[in-house]
C-alpha cells in the first residue's frame, strides 16, 4: 500500500506497517474496507459499544463511523479494556469471538461445578486467512516491532501498542495461544 504520502516513501505491507505502528497504513486499509463496514463489524460481531451518531447540546454531531475514530482510536466515548481484550481474543480462537469472561467456572471445595461460563461461539471473521494474517502481524509486532521484548520463554506472543498525542493514553493489547489481555494507562 502506498499513495506516495507514507513516511518511508515506498510501498509496504500491512504487516510492516503494523510492526512499525504507522497510522497511515491503518487509515489506508480502513479506507479500502470502508468505515461503515468496519463499524458494523466491530459493533455487531465483536460487541464494541460505539457511537453511530450523536448530536451534542451545542449542535455538533459526533460519529465513530469515520477514519480517525476507527483507524486511529479517536472514538467518541473510547473503548473499554474488556472490549479490546475481547476483540483480540478472536485472533487466538480461529476468528471466533467468544465474548469476554471474567471466569470460566466456579467449583466448590469438592470440585463440583457451581457455575460455568460457556463462551459464545459466534463467528467473528468469516475468512480464516484474515485471522491467520492478523495473528502473524501481531506476532511480528512482539518479535520485531514496537512491542519487542514483550515475550515469554517458550510461549508464542503477539500484540499491538498504541499511544495518543503526548502519550496521554498508552495501550498494549496482547495474546498468547490461550489468553488475550489489554492494558491501558491514561487519564493524566
What are the functions of these language-model segments?
Residues 50-69, 99-103, 145-152:
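Surface-exposed patches in mature extracellular/periplasmic domains of secreted proteins
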Residues 1-50, 63-93, 139-140:
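Active-site-adjacent helix/loop patches that line small-molecule binding or acyl-intermediate pockets
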Residues 16, 78-188:
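A penicillin-recognizing enzyme superfamily signal
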Amino acid at each position: 500500500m502506498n499513495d506516495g504520502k507514507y513516511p518511508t516513501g515506498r510501498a509496504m505491507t500491512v504487516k510492516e506497517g503494523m510492526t512499525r505502528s504507522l497510522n497511515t497504513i491503518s487509515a489506508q486499509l480502513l479506507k479500502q474496507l470502508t468505515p461503515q463496514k468496519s463499524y458494523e463489524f466491530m459493533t455487531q460481531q465483536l460487541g464494541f459499544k460505539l457511537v453511530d451518531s450523536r448530536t451534542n447540546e451545542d449542535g455538533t454531531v459526533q460519529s465513530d463511523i469515520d477514519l480517525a475514530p476507527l483507524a486511529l482510536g479517536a472514538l467518541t466515548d473510547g473503548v473499554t479494556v474488556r472490549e479490546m481484550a475481547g476483540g483480540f481474543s478472536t485472533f487466538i480462537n480461529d476468528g471466533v469471538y467468544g465474548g469476554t469472561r471474567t471466569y470460566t467456572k466456579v467449583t466448590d471445595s469438592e470440585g463440583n461445578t457451581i457455575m460455568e461460563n460457556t463462551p459464545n461461539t459466534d463467528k467473528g471473521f468469516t475468512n480464516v486467512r484474515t485471522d491467520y494474517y492478523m495473528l502473524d502481524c501481531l506476532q511480528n509486532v512482539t518479535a520485531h516491532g514496537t512491542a519487542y521484548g514483550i515475550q515469554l520463554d517458550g510461549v508464542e506472543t503477539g500484540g499491538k501498542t498504541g499511544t495518543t498525542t503526548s502519550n496521554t493514553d498508552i495501550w498494549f493489547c496482547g495474546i498468547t495461544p490461550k489468553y488475550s489481555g489489554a492494558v491501558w494507562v491514561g487519564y493524566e
